[in-house]
Swiss-Prot record:
It is an enzyme of class 6 (ligase). This is Asparagine--tRNA ligase. Homodimer. Signal peptide: none annotated. It comes from Clostridium botulinum (strain Langeland / NCTC 10281 / Type F).
């Protein structure tokens, strides 16, 4: 007899009613009495468990009643309807074999565990209800991202994880070396001699795939990357991780408004896809993690995102009467408290803030005609703040070179990026979406460590 997934039993219950099935999975609970026992089994294919009825006539009944939680089993039995119970059916077992007995010190017993505790056992937390839901949603959301871009003709491209350039110009990169740290070769000037290193020059883990993606956009028109990025930023907050995943589309012949349209449609698409394909998980989040989750997500997918300039945002915040820890003035980068005030108190929906001061944005963003601002835009959402950052890219070689000089960037490190402007350059735009940020928004989880399988943060690279 073939194995039937528990997901199939729930999705096509009538098809299996009164029929014999075989399942396998892990024991979640055991409740026994003298003549029968109830065992809940989860096979990993579905958020919900299936209840198995054990009768004392089973030859190994006594052994089964003593199964520790997380014991793996194979079950054969008849599907029976349970019209007056919480679950729509149960399995009356005809045979149960123990595949692998769990130790009695299994840490995930039948009680609620804090997310903080579960982070200390990241190798086991996918077995808990909360993280089973989180990581299934993560999988669905990742698929939805690919589905959105593929259906619109975007080419998926892989950009390098090891790079010699700093896309953001912030210098917060993890440096790579194979040199003996106790005997580092030096030049005559006493500096590190990177010519003796593995790549023959300084190398780092990428902070963004954007610059590489731009090269493909100027060949394929519309492309996107979706991969890991790394920031050596010593920020020990609930919103920052040292390793995270980024979605980075780049579109040729596209202005800033084209990026805004694409990003708005993409966010709505991903949310809708998860809501439709993970109803049980989303109901769990709405009940136990964030009781206002459904209302918030419904507001996002059914509203037109507001679009205002940075200057307008500053003026609104200054006139609002709101009390902030960080003073609002033109030229500062908006803090999370400012972003949330705009989305939660003033507009009560997602907001694109555009045309930021050039001095707080990256070198590759297109300079506006005023000479003070750039064609950049961030998407701010209620409950989180910024989840997307992007811009129209600077296609004018002379303007780009001048901007790099202002920031003391070595043009030789970016020779290939500058050369793109020589061979049929065109206006183009793109953006970056931190995948974990949108997962936090969709699930209601408030800490980035709880939406990534094995979080990497300052002082912690366990598992």
């Amino acid at each position: 007899m073939d194995i039937t997934l528990v997901k199939s039993l729930y999705r096509e219950a009538e098809k299996y009613m009164d029929k014999e099935v075989k399942i396998n999975g892990w024991v979640r609970t055991v409740r026994d009495s003298k003549n029968f026992a109830f065992v809940e089994v989860n096979d990993g294919s579905f958020f919900k468990n299936v209840q198995v009825i054990l009768e004392s006539s089973l030859e190994n009944f006594k052994e089964l009643c003593k199964m520790p939680i997380s014991t793996s089993v194979e079950v054969e039995g008849i599907i029976q309807p349970t019209p007056n119970a919480k679950q729509p059916f149960e399995i009356k077992a005809t045979r149960v074999s123990i595949e692998g007995k769990s130790s009695t010190d299994y840490p995930l017993q039948k009680k609620r565990h804090t997310f903080e505790y579960l982070r200390t056992i990241a190798h086991l937390r996918p077995r808990s209800n909360a993280f089973s839901a989180v990581f299934r949603v993560r999988s669905l959301a990742a698929y939805a991202v690919h589905k959105f871009f593929q259906e619109r003709g975007f080419v998926y491209t892989n950009t390098p994880i090891i790079t010699g350039s700093d896309c953001e110009g912030a210098g917060e990169m993890f440096q790579l070396t194979t040199m003996d740290l106790n005997n580092i070769p030096k030049t005559e000037e006493g500096k590190i001699d990177f010519s003796k290193d593995f790549f023959g020059s300084p190398a780092n883990l990428t902070v963004s795939g954007q610059l590489s993606a731009e090269t493909f956009a100027l060949a394929f028109r519309n492309v996107y990357t979706f991969g890991p990025t790394f920031r050596a930023e010593n920020s020990n907050t609930a919103r920052h991780a040292s390793e995270f995943w980024m979605i980075e589309p780049e579109m040729a012949f596209a202005e800033l408004t084209d990026y805004l349209d694409n990003a708005e449609n993409m966010v709505k698409f991903v949310i809708n896809y998860v809501m439709e394909n993970a109803p049980e998980e989303m109901a769990f989040f709405n009940s136990f993690v964030d009781k206002g989750l459904f209302d918030r997500l419904d507001n996002v997918v059914n509203s037109d995102f507001k679009r205002i300039t940075y200057t307008e945002a500053v003026e609104l915040l200054q006139k609002s009467g709101g009390k902030f820890d960080y003073e609002v003035e033109w030229g500062i980068d908006l803090q999370t408290e400012h972003e949330r005030y705009l989305t939660e108190q003033i507009f009560k929906k997602p907001v694109f803030v555009t045309d930021y001061p050039k001095d707080i944005k990256a070198f590759y963003m297109r300079l506006n005609d005023d000479g003070k601002t750039v064609a950049a835009a961030d998407l701010l959402v209620p409950g989180v703040g910024e989840i997307i950052g992007g811009s129209q890219r600077e296609e004018r070689l002379d303007v780009l070179e001048k901007r790099m000089e202002e920031l003391n960037l070595n043009k030789e490190d970016y020779w290939w990026y500058l050369e793109l402007r020589k061979y049929g350059e065109t206006k183009h735009s793109g953006y970056g979406l931190g995948f974990e940020r949108i997962l936090m928004y969709i699930t209601g989880m408030t800490n980035i460590r709880d939406v990534i399988p094995f979080p990497r943060t300052p002082g912690s690279a366990e598992f």
